[in-house]
Amino acid sequence: MGVTQENKVIARTVLGAFGGKPKVTKYWDDNKNSSIDILSVSDQPQEGITSYSTLGLSDHSINYEVNGTPLRIEIVAAMESASDIYANVLSTCAFNIINSNFTCAPGVIFKNVISMYDQETDMKHIMFVPPFLWEEDLELLEFSNKNVTWLMALPISEGELQVAEKHGSDYLQDLLESKQIDIFDIKRESVV
């Protein structure tokens, strides 16, 4: 199946937000049944950081509708370029939606998607948050058959997961912001 017009618009929108020179890599699930394209741009939004976005995830349902129109997502992230696992982490998040029908919204946590690739870091899970790094540029896209928005994949630790489970994801987001965590550092220490 070729690239749809909608996905071309999505790719242009993401590239407009990220800037720089894009690279697109196709990732396959373990059974080679499903694939997802991951766009990456090195040294964006700053030197030593790579920005990522899924392309085509919005072709799959997250089980949400707004006024009768399916709401779909693409996942964005930014991580130290030295980390070579983050595209894999994003593809695993995408396959959770594509193959396992996970739902996804702000505050939702996908467990153990980092620890699958790196057991040495405190960061184990992904919490989805609004894409605050690019909020000016990644606005809702309205198509005839779907609306597309973006969620940012934010690494969290086991302790931070427990805080979210006890007090809610908004509480955890406020805590992470108050501690001024380095969102680009997958090896950062847990705040709890």
Curated annotation (Swiss-Prot):
<protein>
    <recommendedName>
        <fullName>Immunity protein YqcF</fullName>
    </recommendedName>
</protein>
<comment type="subunit">
    <text>Probably interacts with cognate toxin YqcG but not with other non-cognate toxins. The interaction inhibits the toxic activity of YqcG.</text>
</comment>
<dbReference type="Pfam" id="PF05076">
    <property type="entry name" value="SUFU"/>
</dbReference>
<dbReference type="InterPro" id="IPR020941">
    <property type="entry name" value="SUFU-like_domain"/>
</dbReference>
<comment type="function">
    <text>Immunity component of one of 6 LXG toxin-immunity modules in this strain. They promote kin selection, mediate competition in biofilms, and drive spatial segregation of different strains, indicating that LXG toxins may help avoid warfare between strains in biofilms. Mediates intercellular competition during biofilm formation; disruption of the operon disadvantages the bacteria, but overexpression of the cognate immunity protein restores growth in competition with wild-type. In situ neutralizes the toxic effect of cognate toxin YqcG.</text>
</comment>
<keyword id="KW-0963">Cytoplasm</keyword>
<dbReference type="GO" id="GO:0005737">
    <property type="term" value="C:cytoplasm"/>
</dbReference>
